[in-house]
Amino acid sequence: MALKELFDRDWQELESEGVLFSTLEKLVAWGRSNSLWPATFGLACCAIEMMSSTDGRNDLSRFGSEVFRASPRQADVMIVAGRLSKKMAPIMRRVYDQMPDPKWVISMGACASSGGMFNNYAVVQNVDHVVPVDVFVPGCPPRPEALIYAVMQLQKKVRGEAYDARGEQLPMVEAWTR
């Protein structure tokens, strides 16, 4: 079929013949959502459950998160698993800032989401005070299936975002560096 003939035909007629119509933005969002590369930021017992989400039984790679990246420059999803001490908060922020845009954060476990049972001066009570969190995973520790569900929810969120929607920056909180 010549290109001129293709443009002269009605789009509904072409759609019935199996021609796909979409915007480039939707196509890019679909590609990004199905190729999330997580960076591990395991801080406590939740990290063990995060690691078991990639074993043969759970197989997180079925959902596009193939390999955990050791370098933040190669990752676009940070999974914060466990409690975050105030001494570790600036380091986590630095790792987050080194990740290329667009980037997302999953807060895994009760300790990362609310401080958990560690209600004291040395623990950040919510990772959201340091980096913007996109998905919270409840549990102590959450099961690997819960993390896989969180990745699937993040994929839905990524599909609905515009290409440059994640460019905002939170200021570094000086209270964590004291």
Swiss-Prot record:
Keywords: 4Fe-4S, Cell membrane, Iron, Iron-sulfur, Membrane, Metal-binding, NAD, Quinone, Translocase, Transport. Its EC number is 7.1.1.-. It catalyses: a quinone + NADH + 5 H(+)(in) = a quinol + NAD(+) + 4 H(+)(out). It is found in: Cell membrane. PROSITE patterns: COMPLEX1_20K (PS01150). One of its GO terms (molecular function) is iron ion binding. GO terms for biological process: aerobic respiration; electron transport coupled proton transport. It is a peripheral membrane protein. HAMAP family: NDH1_NuoB. This is NADH-quinone oxidoreductase subunit B.
